[in-house]
A protein has these predicted regions:
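Conserved AMP-binding/adenylation subdomain of ANL enzymes
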Residues: 187-208, 216-256
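Conserved adenylate-forming
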Residues: 57-60, 151-161, 166-211, 231-233
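AMP-binding/adenylate-forming catalytic domain of the ANL superfamily
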Residues: 489-511, 531-539, 543
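AMP-binding/adenylate-forming catalytic core of the ANL superfamily
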Residues: 97, 364-372, 377-378, 385-388, ...
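ANL superfamily adenylate-forming
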Residues: 25-37, 119-161, 170, 175-176, ...
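Gly/Ser/Thr-rich phosphate-binding loop
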Residues: 230, 255-260, 269-329, 343, ...
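Conserved AMP-binding/adenylate-forming core of the ANL superfamily
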Residues: 22-73, 77-81, 98-103, 184
Length: 546
């Protein structure tokens, strides 16, 4: 039985040695200043064994943790698998982290080693010193320095329950939590993807999966990487999403599968149509959060399905759900229905089962004897948060969904993103989706601001396509945006305030940092670049929609 990620890789390398495991496109190679081309399983296996032996000689072993600040480079995979063979857990480090964040990570994770790009060595060493930790730092091509302390679990056998990685949540609110992910988490994620079939069926030894998503998050690291390892496929990691060259990269890479974030289809659809839009080689896209109004038009224009899925870092594939069978309910934020090995409850704020069509919090667990099978093993140094998340034997996701009469699940919003105005629950994501269709809007984030009468009012932070020239132009732009939303949404969902900003607080995966938005929003009304549009929000006359 395969017990570790390294063993899974070695098994595939023995069968598919001549096949490529990685493809680095020239654009990515130029961004990273590395060599473009393909790396075979056999060549990767040789490099990994060399690294494994070097790490072992330097004293690294079971129970150590090693940070990887390597972006989406091939070195990430080679060092990950080599360290995994010894029982060393890897801690992917977001390259955008700075002093305070690195100090927290170094202290909280207790990494013994950081394999990092040379330009970040000083930052990491300074962060570790402030955290009171002894840390070794090396470049990916260096010989490993001696371990600063003995392996904590030296002599203990490796298993599928051995910690494989420590992934930190994106930290959209509060301090990031360290999710302990065992080997089983990654093996189950790749195995799930390899077997789900339907529109997401992976053909052994034939798929070429392109992803611009960062390896510091589970989508690329657990689903994409492990699915390719377990099926003998080729992963094509990009340094990031480049809208202008995206389709050139798709064609040049000979990709058959794409992974996407919800923001990507919206950006790609803004480009002028061309005769090259149809992508016959692409079998499907895997992702989440595509704009409802763009879902069907995107598929018609580019010629492949976008399969919406739901999962979290904490759930892994222990409770993943995907719309990989028809009917997919395109354009409704549907992510399909659960398989037999996943159990789902949807509950109201009172903890009662939600009725069909009624929004409620999604609770999940794995079916069978172990409800946590395939999930994370817990939050590092935070048993209370782990227990709270698993209250009542169900994992509380914090996502608001609803189940339709045919069993399909539809995403509404994150629980903490819901705006409550005059007793009405308003989804920030829903409002953002509509506002993004306005030609003046380049990017938008919606948040609540206090209202003495209604409890909350809706505020939209808009990054305009072109900054308004003066106060009058700003007021007119705000009026146009609100009138558009009034034509698309119930009146109470339209923005009561429109603030024009230069940029939005985003995570590295281009998700809105809701914690920062929550803190930022209340201070915007009354400022020069925020237009009060509350007077435009009027309930339609009774006969207006008849």
């Amino acid at each position: 039985m395969t017990a570790t990620v390294h063993q899974a890789f070695a098994d595939t390398a023995a069968r598919h040695g001549g096949q490529p495991i990685l493809c680095i496109l020239p654009e990515t190679a130029q961004a990273y200043d590395i060599v473009a081309g393909e790396l075979t399983y056999a060549a990767a296996a040789d490099a990994i064994e060399t690294l494994r032996a070097a790490y072992a000689d330097a004293g690294y072993g079971h129970g150590h943790r090693a940070g990887l600040l390597l972006e989406n480079r091939p070195a990430f995979f080679l060092h990950w698998f080599a360290l995994n063979a010894l029982g060393v857990s890897v801690v992917p480090i977001n390259p955008d982290l700075r002093a305070a964040e690195l100090e927290y990570l170094a202290g909280h994770s207790e990494i013994a080693l950081a394999v990092a790009l040379p330009g970040r060595h000083a930052d990491l060493l300074a962060a570790a010193q402030r955290a009171g930790r002894e840390l070794r730092v090396m470049k990916p091509d260096d010989a490993p320095p001696a371990a600063p302390f003995p392996a904590p679990l030296q002599g203990t056998a490796l298993s599928e329950l051995t910690e494989c990685a420590l992934l930190y949540t994106s930290g959209t609110t509060g301090r990031p939590k360290g999710c302990i992910l065992p080997n089983r988490y990654f093996l189950h994620a790749g195995g799930w993807y390899a077997r789900i079939g339907g529109l997401a069926a992976l053909r052994p030894g034939q798929e070429r999966m392109l992803t611009p998503l960062p390896l510091v998050h589970m989508n690329a690291m657990a689903y994409s990487a492990m699915a390719m390892v377990l099926t003998g496929g080729c992963l094509i990691p990009l340094d990031r999403f480049h809208p202008r060259s995206w389709w050139d990269s798709v064609r040049e890479s000979r990709a058959t599968v794409l992974h996407y974030l919800g923001v990507m289809p919206a950006i790609l659809m803004k480009a002028e149509p061309t005769p090259q839009d149809l992508q016959p080689a692409i079998r499907f896209g895997f992702g989440a959060g595509v704009d409802r109004k763009l879902h069907a038009p995107f598929e018609a224009r580019f010629g492949f399905p976008l399969l919406e899925a739901w999962a979290m870092t904490e759930t892994g594939a222990g409770a993943v759900i995907i719309a990989n069978h028809e009917p997919r309910h395109v354009g409704t934020s549907s992510f399909g229905s659960e398989e037999a090995d996943v159990q789902v409850r949807i509950v109201t704020d009172a903890g009662e089962p939600a009725a069909i069509g009624e929004p409620g919090e999604l609770l999940v667990r794995h079916a069978g004897e172990d409800p946590r099978y395939g999930f994370f093993a817990g939050y590092l140094k935070d048993k209370a948060a782990t227990d709270e998340a698993w209250e009542g034997g169900w994992f509380h996701t914090g996502d608001i969904v609803r189940r339709e009469s045919d069993g399909a699940l539809r995403f509404v919003d994150r629980k903490k993103n819901v705006i409550r105005r005059s007793g009405e629950n308003i989804s920030a994501v829903e409002v953002e989706s509509v506002l993004m269709q306005h030609p003046l809007v380049k990017a938008v984030a919606v948040a609540a601001v206090p209202d003495p009468v209604r409890g909350d009012e809706v505020l939209a932070c808009v990054v305009p396509e072109a900054p308004p020239a003066d106060a009058d132009a700003m007021a007119e732009a705000a009026r146009s945006i609100v009138q558009w939303s009034l034509s698309q949404l119930a009146y109470y969902k339209a923005p009561g305030y429109v603030a024009f900003v230069d940029s939005l607080p985003l995570t590295t995966t281009n998700k809105i940092q809701r914690g920062e938005m929550k803190a930022l929003a209340p201070g915007l009304p009354g400022t020069a670049r925020c237009v009060d549009t509350c007077h435009l929000k009027k309930r339609p006359a009774e006969g207006a929609h008849r």
